Amino acid sequence: MASEEYGEPAKHDPSFKGPIKKRGCTDIICCVLFMVFLLGYMVVGILAWLYGDPRQVIYPRNSTGMYCGIGENQGKPNVLYYDLLKCVTGTNILAAAMNGLQCPTTQVCVATCPMDFKWALPNGSPASVYIQEYCQPSINLTTTPLTVAQIAAKELCPVFLVPSTSFFNRCFPGSNLTFPSDFTINGLTANQSRANISEAASQILDSFNFQNVGKKIFEDFAKSWPWIITALVIAMVVSLLFLILLRFTAGILVWVLIVGVIGVIGYGIYHCYMEYDTLNKQGVSVSDVGFTFNLGVYFRVKETWLAILIVLAVVEAILLLVLLFLRKRILIAIALIKEASKAIGHIMSSLFYPLVTFVLLVVCVAYWGMTALYLATSGAPIYRISTVNTSVPGCENITGNETCNPMTFKPSSSCNEARCIFYRYNNEGLFQTNLFNLQIYNVIGFLWCINFVIALGQCVLAGAFASYYWAFHKPKDIPFFPVAESFMRTLRYHTGSLAFGSLILTIVQLIRIILEYVDHKLKGAQNPCTRFLLCCLKCCFWCLEKFIKFLNRNAYIMIAVYGKNFCVSAKNAFKLLMRNIVRVVVLDKVTDLLIFFGKLIVVGGVGVLAFFFFSGRIPIPNDSFKSPTLNYYWIPIITVVLGSYMIAHGFFSVYNMCVDTLFLCFLEDLERNDGSQEKPYYMSKSLMSILNKKNRPPKSEEKKKKK
């Protein structure tokens, strides 16, 4: 029944000796479409580069529209706001700074932010009251004929300065300011001045708590990056050592891995029981705590530890049952891993191919990021005349709609508080009106290129490992440069097929992004039915994406071996897997699970080491090598864990692809051959012994044995 529904088993082909040498180009239409799309993607990048100016985001501007830190303001990377009260009243200062906006007060580029309090005394001389560094370049305090009051009225120098810190090159007031007792501004009393400045500073700090958090995170990275790199190097070394050990002792390592997981869960059960027993004797119950958002409280009640204990016990029981009933399947999985170890041992260059994939992925991400940045900053900046208080005599006619040029703008005598401030970027013109469409094109190009690079790596590795499996006399029949040959063969003949498969995956991922966007926009305004429908759609497309990734992976293996187009290869791979569905579910997934556990060992080991190091729990006798004092020690720990997982995934993905390729070839081998002299098996003797298969010796040897 299975044969009729999912096709007949593959028949023996005497001429088949592994990946077919003579093949033609596949999915040419999709190849042409992909090339045209890439040309369009390059055009989008060129247009973005011509029209965009990322300096508008990277560098702040002064009141004249000049960038701080470059050009005439070289060495002055920070911008200082003269009247902080106007910034708080007129606009959201941090949001304005992040979007390139300016608040309605004079801004100048400065080398460093103010470190001390300073305020203007009306009876002093300009040189003694003001600081030249923080005044506009047009005024010289030693030679100016203007008085202190006239300079303050024209905002040529700041009336007051408070200790500030630089955040994204903007000078913001520091927290917990202690004002001098005689501090006064704008004719206010000392108490009123302190109250106004404190309120302005607190509004900024309270509205943007992430200011200090973000700054501290950057500081943590600056302090800990050498140790982060050291931890990532350790992760790479551990991954290589694990693969080397797997090369020689696959069976022992797999069983140690399984026993280790069971032991860790067993220890978790023991620890939960001890915590439960201690809290039970103390009589602390969840009824005594009630409902609270402080999750740490729940770990001080016995019911929490009892629930965790039950869950771990159930997981432990399931694992033991799986080991009991699937022991033979695990032995076959171990044999596949051993065979993969042998294959990688003969094709060591395959371990370095993830570096090629990584470089290509970095190029894709960098191109997407730069294109998005240049597109976002395209269009000339528009400035408009604005003032904080339109009720001031002479400022009634200022509506905020009149454009201006910050390079030539000067306040009128009737409204001295008028300022020329940034409004937005110009969105008129053919290019600017299509920015949203170009950003969508950029996202699609990013997803398609990323998926194509991953597909290329899978197909290249599949071709290399397939050449190992179908080599009857190993290693004599293995090509000299299997990875390089597979790479050139894949690019020459199957670019269209890889583009086709990656396009299908890109469409599904794009639909998922749209669903996430719709869900985000409708959050808080959707009814339960809409929420349920969106949740179902997101779940379905998540499953569809996983299925397409699985199908594409096996289709690329068939493409690498037989050189057929994507649809035929996907169909043949799907039918082959369905004809052997039990082996697929048990053998392939058990192997994937074991490799996943290997990743966890690498990531967990390096993560635990990073935790003890960055939390200061590892005593280092040498003072020159010690964990830095960090604000948030979990930031480098998370970075190390994520980086370790990426490194481990890169190395183990080679193993995973090798096992998947050998498994698919193994299924084809079982269908094509029967062990006879005309149809000998290509699988290793260990696999044949587990399956009770063997190749019959030649007739001449049989006669010798009979004699």
UniProtKB/Swiss-Prot annotation:
Glycans are attached at residues 62, 140, 176, 191, 196, 389, 397, 401, 622. Keywords: Antiport, Cell membrane, Glycoprotein, Membrane, Transmembrane, Transmembrane helix, Transport. It comes from the Eukaryota. It is found in: Membrane; Apical cell membrane. GO terms for molecular function: antiporter activity; choline transmembrane transporter activity; thiamine pyrophosphate transmembrane transporter activity. Residues 1-27, 247-249, 327-354, 464-494, 578-593, 655-707 are cytoplasmic. Signal peptide: none annotated. It is a multi-pass membrane protein. Residues 49-225, 271-305, 376-442, 516-556, 615-633 are extracellular. InterPro entries: Choline_transptr-like. GO terms for biological process: acetylcholine biosynthetic process; acetylcholine secretion; choline transport; neuromast hair cell development; otolith formation; positive regulation of cell growth; thiamine pyrophosphate transmembrane transport. Belongs to the CTL (choline transporter-like) family. This is Choline transporter-like protein 4. The lineage of its organism: Eukaryota, Metazoa, Chordata, Craniata, Vertebrata. The gene is slc44a4.
